Amino acid sequence: GLSHSGMHTLGKALFGAEEILSGSVHANGKNIKHTKDAIKAGVGYTSKDRDYESLCLQSPIIDNITSTGYEKNRAFGPFISRKKEAEYCQEQIDKLQLKCASMYHLVSTLSGGNKQKVVFGKWLAADSKILILDCPTRGIDVGVKANMYKMIYDMKKAGKAIVFISEELPELVGMSDRILILKDGKVSLEIARKEGFSEHKLIEYMI
């Protein structure tokens, strides 16, 4: 949809970050009323405003990636194992080919593409089954976008369910199995790939 169609608000609502006035959201048998419910249900969310809503810029890479992995990195009781955290973080750095001198460097020092990899890393490390990606390629140069698309495709092949929110029709047409168009907060069109995606038709339902 267009930028004010309600798609960004919908993404937040699916993750429990936006109050729902009517209806409900369920994932893996759990009712999502808050972000903590979503995380427990295996739902991850990347915001279009990643610097402000998905990352702690003045914290190191390791703190960002391990922020969703408390249970996996516990030593005993409430205590965290620093060794487990470092291994947990390094696994994502290697898997996502994140370019950084050290996992202890601040996220603010990274390029846009590598910042987005940190966001992906924290949800993949948490083994999220459903990923809500709101404009994941925004602010990323063309060369890095192709790498991002491959990462998203690999997530899909690994069995993740992807909710891809975007204002860019070419990437939606190229990546989606099914497209929902939002206009004025309502679904104006739902169409599957097998029915044929036409950019002209999609635009018609957007404006």
Please identify what each model-predicted range represents.
Residues G1-I207:
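Glycine-rich phosphate-binding loops of nucleotide-dependent enzymes
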